[in-house]
Design a protein with these regions (language model features):
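Transmembrane alpha-helix boundary/anchor motif
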Residues: 23, 27-28, 124, 192-196, ...
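Transmembrane alpha-helical segments that form the functional core of multipass membrane systems
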Residues: 178-295
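Membrane-spanning alpha-helical segments of multipass transporters and channels
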Residues: 232, 247-399
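Structural signature of transmembrane alpha-helix termini at the membrane-water interface
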Residues: 5, 27, 31, 35, ...
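Juxtamembrane loop-helix boundary motifs flanking transmembrane segments in multi-pass membrane proteins
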Residues: 1-4, 71, 117, 156, ...
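Structural motif marking the loop-to-transmembrane transition
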Residues: 1, 5-16, 170-181, 212, ...
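Extracytoplasmic/periplasmic domains immediately adjacent to an N-terminal transmembrane anchor
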Residues: 2-176, 360-361, 365-399
């Protein structure tokens, strides 16, 4: 373990990844999304329908907290020009047949476009349109039932048979910071550990060397470093940005422990496929976005196809993010996140066995190669000795 710790602190690239990235990235993400919400975001509306239905929809959108209808355009090109000039952060498009399709009792469509410079813009325009759409569905159904001669009481029972109201106990103002930063914190831990371990392995392969310490000792070195980083990310940073911290400390520490050892086993397994230390930075851009979407934070797990749900089980962050959301935001206890803990422990067992087998194979390969090299050098030395002895014999014979 001590040898691996010395290697970690002797490699400047690994120190940058582990310490600088692990400590600064959570703070940077928190500062970017500190407010968590954007109110009255300017949008442009392109109403090609010019119907009473589209005008009513636009009025309701403008009344929401999330967006402000700053411009009404006659064409999509005009709306795109406004977005390029950064005068608006989104566009809502009503097609020409919007009112006609509703009149024919057919499904109508509304298109939304958001400036993806920030997820907040996408969230705002999507939430505003979805809330108004749900309200419009009630209005359309009420109008259609009234045209059939139904009474107000019967219409109310048909439109809303079970009265319901929106109640969001753990994120009342739909703050983006609460659910995004919670996921980002765990991704920082997983990704920086994987990239740091991959850089170390890439350096060893480029030098045609192998690890001389035991796998358990090396794993303990990384776990020791990252327990501190994980406690900083999951305990200090949420308090720094005044995020909800409803969970009990022992439950959070247990989740941190299982997540860290799972990340160590995951990193030791997949870092074997990294041959050069520079290639790992290319994987950073791909893996981070993929893990975020597969965690269930932005893309609901219930809506994932079976294939992508299976892919999400590859990464420790999937189970850890779900468990951290439940503990930190909803005050869940360890028995309540039993499926996530089982997932982390199962991953740890699988990746540990895989890492041991790959390490055993690599050591055998290295020892075999070293043995062959020694035999080759021995034969070469023996050949030189025999040649020297032959030369000496010839020299003695010529005297």
């Amino acid at each position: 373990m001590l040898k691996e710790l010395k290697r970690i602190f002797a490699d400047s690239y690994v120190l940058i990844i582990f310490l600088l990235s692990g400590l600064l990235y959570p703070v940077i993400y928190g500062l970017i999304y500190y407010k968590g919400t954007v109110d009255e975001m300017p949008v442009a509306v392109v109403d090609l329908s010019q119907s009473s239905d589209s005008r009513r929809f636009i009025q309701k959108i403008d009344a929401t907290r999330e967006v402000d209808v700053a411009y009404k355009c006659v064409s999509m090109a005009e709306g795109q020009e406004l977005m390029e000039e950064r005068k608006v952060r989104g566009i809502v498009l009503f097609p020409e047949d919007y009112g006609d399709r509703l009149a024919r009792m057919e499904q109508a469509t509304i298109s939304t476009y958001a400036d993806m410079a920030s997820f907040l813009y996408y969230k705002n325009i999507t939430m505003a349109v979805n809330h108004v759409m749900i309200d419009e569905l009630r209005t359309i159904e009420t109008t259609r039932f009234a045209s059939l001669g139904m009474t107000d009481e019967a219409i109310a029972q048909m439109v809303e048979a079970i009265p319901a109201e929106e109640n969001i106990p753990f994120n009342t103002n739909w703050s983006f910071l609460i659910f995004f930063l919670s996921a980002a914190l765990l991704l920082v831990i997983q990704q920086t550990m994987f990239f740091g371990v991959s850089v170390m392995n890439g350096s060893m392969r480029e030098g045609k060397a192998t690890h001389d310490g035991s796998l358990i000792g090396r794993a303990a070195a990384y776990a020791l470093v990252y327990v501190g980083i994980a406690c900083y990310c999951l305990l200090v940073v949420p308090a720094l940005f005044k995020m909800p911290q409803r969970g009990q400390l022992p439950d959070l520490l247990a989740l941190i422990f299982f997540f860290v050892i799972d990340c160590v086993a995951f990193s030791f397994t997949f870092s074997r496929f990294v041959r050069h230390r520079e290639t790992v930075f290319v994987e950073l851009l791909f893996m981070s976005s993929l893990c975020l979407f597969l965690s269930g934070t932005i893309w609901p797990v219930s809506s994932m196809p079976p294939f992508w749900k299976a892919v999400s089980w590859v990464f420790p962050s999937t189970f850890a993010i779900q468990g951290f959301h439940a503990i930190n935001n909803a005050a869940a206890t360890l028995p309540m996140i039993r499926p996530q803990l089982i997932g982390l422990i199962s991953q740890f067992a699988f990746y540990s066995v895989a890492a041991f087998l790959m390490d055993y194979r690599e050591r055998n390969h290295y020892e075999s190669r070293l043995h062959k090299l020694i035999e080759k050098r021995t034969r070469l030395i023996e050949g030189r000795i025999k040649a020297r002895q032959a030369q000496e014999a010839v020299f003695e014979a010529t005297k």
